[in-house]
Amino acid sequence: MIETKIKSIALKDREKIIKIRRQIHSNPELAFKEFKTSKLIKEELDKLNIEYIDVAGTGVLATIKGKNNSGKTILLRADMDALPIKEENELEFKSINDNMHACGHDAHVSWLLGTAMILNHIKEELNGNVKLLFQPGEEKGGSDIVIKENVLEGVDALATGHCWPTIESGKIGIARNCAMAATNTFEITIIGKGGHGAEPHNCIDPIAVGNAVYSSIQQIVSRKIDPVIPVVVSVCSFNSGVSKNIIPDICILQGTIRAISQEKVIEVSKILENIVRSVCKAHGADCKFEKSAGGDAVINDKNMIELGRRSACKILGDENVEMIDFPAMTGEDFAIYMKEKPGLFMYIGVGNKEKNINYRLHNNKFDIDEKCLSTASSLLSQLAVDYLCQF
């Protein structure tokens, strides 16, 4: 059976993929600056004699052509960029700079290279083509740039996986509908009237107004939104003042809105703006409200969900495949591709409680159980095989 062959190849290449992951992990590069990562990817593809082209600067798009060409093509994607976080893990392959793969993109690149090794080995049995997209700048919405370079031309379906620390390594999760939230960001500038800290009565204190705005924002989700609809409004930055005895002129709050559709995000943004303007007016302050559109929600295609479930069960067993009813409220620019083609976004378990590998994404102690690398490589390979056979 093909799944037996896939798992056997993944096991054989396991140490090779771990080595690649550790090399990438120790040299994390920020969005659109993934030069060393891109070079490593190309070197590994060259070893396999897999054709590829450059996309979006540091990105790479490889193609594996099956012998039995049905005319169908599935694209598998991994993101490449790191975050500006100082790593606190004590690992032999710890980051050597001030950046960190705290979102697991080092693992994503590694397991997609593992997938390339597997599929290249069995390409005589592929009933179509597989494209492998190593995408730069996910943290900065890199898919917007990539998609303009026609990477989806000739592609019929898409799939990807993301490190998920709350799921144990060796298991995966598949969302039944929405996998990742739609997003936006906002910035509130409260304009008061500065003065001496001893004379607040002669000032319009923007810090006091900012506190009132912050408190009012906490009422949006609990009092303005249907409790069965997932919505998050978070203020993540609150800045004002530079001196101990001067009431400043302005206060700036920054944050994000998350919901299961961009329409809901826009609705919540309007509620937020009305609250901000009303509170500021009540305190005699002026304000500026600025928002920037974020990504759309990641919505899994129904047919791809079922295909992914069946493929995962072949590789992992039914007991290690979790169907998830509620979305994660994080965002992902894979949504851009899924607006164009049917796709599947999977949560790849990377946690291991016994090894204390349970820190969340974007944490300076985030790590993975490297067992997940062969799991993901096998799963993505099986998914590609099954898609090309079925459709």
Language model: regions and residue ranges:
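Acidic/His- and Gly-rich active-site-bordering loop/insert found
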Residues: 2-101, 106, 110-126
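Divalent metal-coordination and catalytic microenvironments
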Residues: 24, 62, 76, 105, ...
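Non-cysteine beta-strand/loop elements that form the S-adenosyl-L-methionine
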Residues: 75-77, 186, 345-350
